[in-house]
Amino acid sequence: MNDLKKSPLLILDFGSQYTQLIARRVREMGVYCEIYPYHINHEQFKKLNPCGVILSGGPSTVTHDANPRAPQWLFESDLPLLGICYGMQTMAVQLGGQVHSSALREFGYAELRLHGHSQLLSNIEDRTAVDGSALLDVWMSHGDKVTELPPGFKVICETRNAPIAGMADESRQMYGLQFHPEVTHTLQGLRILQRFVVDICKAPTEWTPEHIIDEAINKIREQVGTEKVLLGLSGGVDSSVVAALLHRAIGEQLVCVFVDTGLLRLNEAEQVLSMFGRHMGIRIIAVNAEDKFLTALKGVTCPEEKRKIIGRTFIEVFDEEAQKLTDIKWLAQGTIYPDVIESAATSTNDAAVVIKSHHNVGGLPDTLNLKLLEPIRELFKDEVRQVGLELGLPHDMVYRHPFPGPGLGVRILAEVKKEYADILRKADAIFIEELHNAQLYHKISQAFAVFLPVKSVGVMGDGRRYDYVICLRAVETVDFMTAHWSQLPWDFLGKVSNRIINEVEGVSRVTYDISGKPPATIEWE
């Protein structure tokens, strides 16, 4: 088959929080795209041979000369270009237009009125005005605005506060949009992006799960040959899909190590070993390291320190098992595209603050001296799930809610003890079971229980109890960057609370977390 990446769409990143969302929308069309920093090298650009370019938004202002600009040679490349928000503004300035800061800023919904005909927006509308003009509901987020068009451009849409909300030079296939078509709040946003990517750029639409799997298998076989591959299997979506993909590609050459940290969900170890070992026939080395992890965590209450200890201990256990396998040449990892983007530091916001270290246990040991294999490093999480389904993994496994790498260690808001982990495991399992029973599980994005290190008075029968408190957390989100707490039915929450208090020894009270993100994070630690 043809190389799926031979003529990608490129997204040049100016630091927008929505840059990855643009890429996900493009991938949804079946088009392969990649994200690069706005200052991409010209030689690298030519080697990529893109079919078109999108300039992302960003937090800077083009009214300051020192702020980011697109490479000037880009505007002489004869490729279709689409600038979004900051991308439109830098396009305007660099091609001879003008941008000024505005006292009338636009943040949130705006009604967009289309001007005449443009290839980008023609026949796309939410409704029509009395005079017959097409109207769109769009999402704005800007303080600056284009006040004078570059030579050769025309206005293609406007809002009340932005007379130039979109511009086009049809002869050179250059377009600018002040609003954000990539967010779901812009109802016709996907159609607009599709018009640019598929119709104007003529991008091939072959980026499908079937083709992705075929190409990945061919690449794995070509890289690995007859050598053996080691994979740390956690039971999470990423490592599970890597295991299934590698097993299909190289069969018995794959060896997995599964580490039971003692901080997993109820029956999780048994489920992973059953699915991948007994049912799929993958060779799995199972290590029960509960005592080692609990000993290492003894007396530690700081969340960041707990993360570091869990990560370090995991590496030690994995390294110990790997050293026993003398014929392994490759180490496979479930690195996905957002990890690659973040590690490549494509964002222009160098002053970003680390809220908490990344949950996923990473940094497997360099001492293994193995070649690295990352078969899903070009996929977003939603694409990983689609590939997993195509490989035959169960829907419930592929669409299981996210679980942090440190496991229950960051859901016990105290020193991690076996007693606390056992209580939390049972309470969490009841919550998840009832969400499934009520057909609510797949309507929310993430749900879990948290163990609180406080005791509360309760009454059971004629006796007085002084036991621990469990807090339930459920959120709804599109991208996990922001989240709303889920408004679960009161009778449902009452049923879950009743079951936990009656069935989990050591719990006298259940609460529900009604904090959004921001200001709270989704996980408590």
From Swiss-Prot:
Record carries keyword Nucleotide-binding: yes
Class of this enzyme: ligase
Pathway stated in the Swiss-Prot or TrEMBL entry: Purine metabolism; GMP biosynthesis; GMP from XMP (L-Gln route): step 1/1
Domain Glutamine amidotransferase type-1 residues, every copy: 8-206
Keywords: ATP-binding, Glutamine amidotransferase, GMP biosynthesis, Ligase, Nucleotide-binding, Purine biosynthesis
GO cellular component terms, A-Z: cytosol
Chain positions recorded as ATP binding sites: 234-240
InterPro entries: Class_I_gatase-like (IPR029062), GATASE (IPR017926), GMP_synth_C (IPR001674), GMP_synth_GATase (IPR004739), GMP_synthase (IPR022955), GMPS_ATP_PPase_dom (IPR025777), NAD/GMP_synthase (IPR022310), Rossmann-like_a/b/a_fold (IPR014729)
Pfam assignment, any one: GATase
SUPFAM superfamilies linked to this entry: Adenine nucleotide alpha hydrolases-like (SSF52402), Class I glutamine amidotransferase-like (SSF52317), GMP synthetase C-terminal dimerisation domain (SSF54810)
EC number(s) from the headed UniProt entry: 6.3.5.2
Catalytic activity: XMP + L-glutamine + ATP + H2O = GMP + L-glutamate + AMP + diphosphate + 2 H(+)
Residue positions of the active site: 85, 180, 182
GO molecular function: ATP binding; GMP synthase activity
Domain GMPS ATP-PPase: 207-400
UniProt subunit comment: Homodimer.
Function: Catalyzes the synthesis of GMP from XMP.
NCBIfam families reported in the protein's UniProt record: guaA_Cterm, guaA_Nterm, PRK00074.1
HAMAP family with a match to the protein in the record: GMP_synthase (MF_00344)
Protein's name in the database: GMP synthase [glutamine-hydrolyzing]
Organism: Legionella pneumophila (strain Corby)
